[in-house]
Every structure is written in C-alpha cells, then in structure tokens.
Amino acid sequence: MIDIDVFIVSMVFISPILFASFVLLAGNKFTINKIFPVISILISIFCTILVWEKLNLSESKVIEVNQIFYIDGFSILMQLMIEIVALITILYSPQYLAKLYSHRQNKFHLYYSTILYSTAFMNLAFVLNNLFLIYIFLELSTILVIYLIAFNLQKEDLKASFKYLLFINVGILFSLLGIILLSYFTGTLIFLSNISFYVASLPKHIALICAVLFIIGFFTKSGLIPFHVWLPDSYSESPSPITVFLAGAVTKIGFYGIVRTVTVFSFHFQEIQTLVIILSSLSMFFGAVLAFNQRDLKKMIAYCSISEMGFIASALVLNSYIGILGGVFHIINHTLMKGILFFSTGILIFAYGSSKIDEIKKSFGNISWVSPMFFIGALAVAGMPMFGSFLSSITIFFALTESGFLWTSIILILSGFISGLALLRTAIFLFWSKKEQNQILNKIQLPASMVLSTFVLTFLLIIFGVFPEIIYPLLEIATNGIIKMSH
Amino acid sequence: MELIFISILILTFFAGESKNLRFSVYCLIANSLFIVTSVFTMGFTYNITSLYWIAFLDLLVRVFIVPLFILKSIKNRIHSEIKPTISHPLSIALSIVVLSLVYHFMGIFKTMNLPQVLPSFACGITLFIYGLYLLISKNDTVKMVICFFIVENGIHLLIISLIPHLPKFIEFTLTFNFIVAISFFLYIILRLNEILVKEEIEKLRQTKAIHRLEE
C-alpha cells in the first residue's frame, strides 16, 4: 500500500479527533457546535467508502499495513455503521438538548466532542491489528461515554453511570486478562492476522480459560445476560440520542470483540460454541421475559435489546457462512430497530417529559409521526416480514437448526414473539386505546430533525427488508472477512 | 523479590479490609510504593530500561495522583465505609484464604519455563482475583473505586510480567486509560456526594419547618 492509502485509512479516525478538538476549544459557538461534528463524520464516511473500494480491488480482501492495520470487510461494516449512528445522533440532538437539557447549555460542546472522540477511538480500534491496542482504544471509547450518560447530572443518571463504569471497566478487564494469558502461553504478541494460528496451537484447557475470559469481557460490553446489569439503567437514564448511540455503537464494540476473539475460539473448539449458544439463549429468553412487565418504555426496549443481542451472539459463533451472515445482518438491523424505538421514545419524552408508560398515557396528545414509526419498530422486533430483521432472524434460525441447535432456534422464535408482543401491547395502549373524555388533545409541534432522523432509520429498515441485495455486498465481504480470519 | 510481592499482598489486604477509608488510601499509597520498587527492581535485575520509565510513571500516578483524587472524594463525608454485604470477620477470613490460596496456586506458573516472563505474574493474578472478590462484597462507592484500583494494580503487574514481549507504549497507554477511568469515577462520586448533601440539607429544612408548624 502506498502512503496515500495510509492517509485515507488514518483520516477515518483523525477527522473526528481533529474536529472534536476544534469543538472543544471553540466552546459553545453555534455554527461550530452543530456543523463541525457533521462535517467530520461525513469526511469519515467518505474515507471509509474509499477504503472499502480499495478492499474490493484487493485480491485477498484484507488490507494489512506493517502489522499496524488489519482491515477486512467486517472492519468496514462496523466503521460505516458507527459513523452513521454518530451522524444521526448528532442530527437528532440539538432540539432535544435545547428543550430538555437547557440547564447544561454551557456544556453542549463537550457533549458533541465526546461523541466525536468516542467515534474516532472506535473507528481506530476497528482497523488495528494488535489485540492489546484494540483493547486500549475500545476501552477508551467506552469510558468517554460515561460523560454522556451522566450528562443530566441528576442522582439517577450519576448512579447509572457509576454502575456502567464499574461493570464495563471491570468486565472488559477480563478480556484484557484473556489477551495477557494468550500472549503468556504463546510467548508472543497476538495480532488479528495470526490469532487463528496461535489459538489452534493452544492446549484445550488453556484455550478454554482464555475463551471464557473473552466471553465474560465482551458479553459484559455487549450487555448480554448474565452480565447485563449496567444496561437497562444506562439506557433509561441517558438522553435519548445517547441511548441510540449506546445501543447502536457502544454495545456493538462488544460484538466486534466477540468476532475477533470468541468466534476464532469457537471455530477451533466446539465447547466454546456450545457455551456461547447457551448464554445467548439465556439472553434471548430472559431479556424478552423481563421486557414484558416494564413500566418504563426505555427499560422495556433495553430488555428487548438484550434479547435481540442474544440472536447475534449465537449466530456469530456458528461455524457456517449463513450463521455469520445472519449475525452480521442482525447487527445492522438491531441498530436500526433500536434506533427507531429509542428515537420515537425520545420524541415522546420531548413532548411529555417522561418515559414512564403511565405518565405518557395520561398526558398523551396528538403526535402524528411517532405512532407509525414506533409500530414499525415493534413489528420489526417481532420479526415480521418486510423488514430487514425478518431476513436476518430467519437466516439465524436456519443456521442454528442446521448446526444442531434446534432448541436455540425455538427459543429465538419464542423470544422474538414475546419481545414483539410486549412492544406492540405498549404501542396499542399508548397510541390506539380510547382516551378519557375530558382529555384535551393538543397538537404538538415536533422538530423536523428529530422526525427525519427517525424516518431515515425506518426507511433503511424497510429497504433492507424489501431489497436486501442493496446491503448484501457489504454483508458478504464482512462475512468472508470473519471466516477468513477465524480459519 | 518474593518479599516485595508478599508485602504488596499484605498491604492490599489492609487497604481492602480496613473500615476507615482514609487508612485504606494510605495503605494503597504504601502498596503502590512497593509496586514501584518491584518494577524498578525488575528493571535493574533483567536490565530493561523501559521499566525505569514505567516505575517513574507509577510513582506519579499510583502513589500521588490517584490517591490524592480518592482523598479529595472522601473529604466531605464520613470516613468509615458503608456496611459491606459480607460481615467484617468473615470477610477478613475469606480475604486471607483468597490471597494465600491464589498466590500459592499461581506459583505453578513459575514452573512453566516460559521465555522471558517476569516474576510479577502470580502476584498480578492474585491481586486481580482478590480485587474482584472485594468489589462483589463492598457497598461503598469510594471503597469500590479502591477495589477497582486493586484490580488495576493486578492487571498492571500482569502486563509488567509480559514487558519483554510488548511494545513499550502499551503500558503507558493503559496507564492513561486508568487515569481517565479513575477521574470519571471520582467525578461521579463527587457529584453524587453533592446531591446527597443537598438532599440531606433539604430534609433537615423540611423537618425543622414541620417542627416549627407543630410548635
């Protein structure tokens, strides 16, 4: 690779760092606050697409630079997804913050720069080759998000962010311990380009110890049961755009870690595959069951999210093309579904100041845009046809059945049904059930940016469901990248 | 060398089990001084110059900056920790068992003849496991940060044991992450303390107002 290519790869993460620093230094100047973050993310997206083009032209479908960078299709997919989530989060935020967080107006520049820094470190982690360095930047991006969760500085926000920081930091230290043990027993540094070779050469008991450490670390990061304790509180207490950022970007870091470590182990050791699938089934089932009785809309969606993430984790350890393909596709669909649901909830909070179902119902007025989008999100969670989530769920279902995990595929269908039912029941209660006679229906004006952000995600979810061939080239290159690295 | 590691474990035990938070922090400072000594000694014994730099950084971060942060966070509150989930005598007994058993068990790794792995590995693993045990058993937020410090010390010693194989900047970057994490922890604790103090004052005012009305 020539230097210009290194420059393009670097710009993917340097651009958000530079612009974040500008925003941080410039303070709360209107144009800089709102325009710079968008420009920086657009530059990142542009550079990622250029790298994707380079990757398509290369024979091996992997770009390696001096043992520093390792870029395959999965890196590109993750980068694009995180950049789009960051962009939509930034576009959704201004009106939301202006109304609900006006008391923190003098810190808005910190809010935007933290999103940019976090995006930059994630982007950097997705292209690195050395496992230690990947860990360092994943951890750094995770820690920075604390500021966003605790942005409101109220008691409950601070408690939720303390829980997040404690669980995530300690949890992810397990994965660092896994990396240390792996290096200790192989006597060398572990890179993505050589991890499969060294894992295959490990004695079984050592491999199992390392894999369990990675599972604890990255399952905690993704918020899968039984390491999910931080997730519902963090989702419900943070500002709605940040909830989308958490669900669409931060928890996905855990899946990146799973793909780069646990998937490799599962390809060589059947026991790891079984262990992960058992844990994922627990997440699928209990996530859905716990969602059912929640009275806080955000917590309900958070538990549904845990259930859905179980689908992804179970698919990513299957030693088959369709399994990995389904898992990767569901990562994207999960981001879109949770984005729609949390953004819709954000609009309700914007209008009524609460995410409690009963309180919203009491003061519910006339919001024309939210109900159809929330319904689409709920139907997609239930795995209805016409949405991308249907295709990915059904792919995972067939992959699990083919690999001999019929019981998991039954749990998958069941939990999808329970989650969908919980959300649809709430949606019907909120939007369709009869209102009290004396209730005044106010027409509420919603900011265009908030509605448009939600609409874009809804549109993408439907488009990927009806025309999956649009996203397939990216999914294919990502799946082949994962399989190539793991074998 | 062995004596230094045993001193680290004993001081960690005092830091973890002491009910007085201020005393816990002082134990941590002494503990960190021993960690600095161990890193420096390993640098000297195995002739690895980067360990001198790491020892210097440890002195700055683990002996001065982080303990100062923690001391600041307990400035406006009661110095004894909130009652833990496990009773104190049982916790002390469990701590002794965890520390001695794990350290003894991890001695097995020394027989593995791994090329150029420094001897801090067993101590690192022991601190990591002991810190996790403490984290589960404690309820006080500041004590939890102290436990996190212990877990991190464990990871630090583990990384040090692999230093001959690692690019040198990895340890520096990890230390940077550690400082960022601790800063956020203490930022949250300070903010929480402020809110709790405000709530207490508000409660007191309301009680006084009720008393006045009754009179």
Residue ranges and their predicted role:
Chain B
Residues 1-215:
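Alpha-helical transmembrane segments of multi-pass membrane proteins predominantly involved
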